[in-house]
């Protein structure tokens, strides 16, 4: 799957998320107000959503398109449907 997505972009985003989660962990130990911690959790969640968009876009641009072009449209549509359902469940 790596060849089908923007891996460099995805890795950059994931490293940022790792930093955000580590910062949240430190905030808990530093007795930071709950509202501030929740704001950072929301930011990390939004960043994960952005990663999901990158993966979904790669899936559509490559996996689904390849399936349709090679005459396996039904399988490509099923794969697309599953990917969209999983992405929607992230919300």
Please provide the spans of the model-predicted regions.
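Solvent-exposed interaction patches of small proteins and small membrane subunits
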Residues: 1-91
């Amino acid at each position: 799957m790596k060849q089908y997505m923007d891996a460099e972009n995805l890795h950059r985003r994931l490293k940022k998320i790792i930093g955000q989660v580590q910062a949240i962990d430190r905030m808990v130990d530093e007795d930071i107000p709950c509202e501030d911690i929740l704001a950072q959790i929301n930011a990390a969640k939004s960043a994960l959503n952005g990663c999901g968009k990158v993966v979904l876009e790669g899936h559509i641009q490559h996996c689904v398109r390849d399936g349709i072009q090679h005459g396996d449209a039904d399988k490509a549509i099923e794969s697309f449907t599953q990917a969209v359902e999983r992405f929607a469940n992230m919300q």
